């Protein structure tokens, strides 16, 4: 587990939070610009001046103001990946990777052996073996970030910090690096704090989520639960939707479709070449869900889920509301007009049919 109790006071900003985060997987730190995301990472790394509180990673205490403990950054077992790759331009990829291991390579033979093994593992995990002899200016943005991540994990850190690592990449390069980050998440048995303001990155990569706004924690928890809490900034706007974990339950070869089964029903989506039993994540956006009070007949919408209304909450626009639906163990969002809610006489607890017009495979 990660235990964070952090307080940073500035003239125009205050970061004050207390968190307990999982000891494995990706925790997304989400929020608008100026919410304190990067300040949180810098505090964990020991880079913020005058920070107070307690930082404990597993059994290791990195900071405890009351006990007078505050380890300098170089004594904290962490890897840090920034928006820009920060590779040394005069060194090749291989030389950049080895540069970070100099301290370990000066130690005992056993430490040297372990360091070399970790370096080779990071090269394989990030798929950069063919890039080792290239110079940084010969790499694409996505390749540079993969090298930077490999350099960070080669030191076998207890904690990996990533500060918007995809922010400087164009859409094509972001899509290129997503699978590598997912592999990293699944292969490493360490916690990762991942700062982002991208809902796509959250849904594709994160296991846990913290929502920050103006230096305060607005929500935290498993990502699928946080994404359906209508009081959170993350569900405001066109990106509002549910993240559902399931598996491929069946294939329809004739129509090139795959069925995704989950605790609450199933939906059909276009075949992505996945095999039956494969674990997947799907996203259903609130704007793609409509409701009916009886089972729809003679409709082109193929995905229909039995549900009950959990809540009806005003949306930022006065013409709309956000409806939270319970589908078995899962929650689904639907953005409707107030007129539709009035005409259908929808109310909390009412059974309905949710018609899902579109499903996105995110992982």
Where are these regions (language model features)?
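ABC ATPase NBD coupling module
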Residues: 62-79, 103-106, 110-116
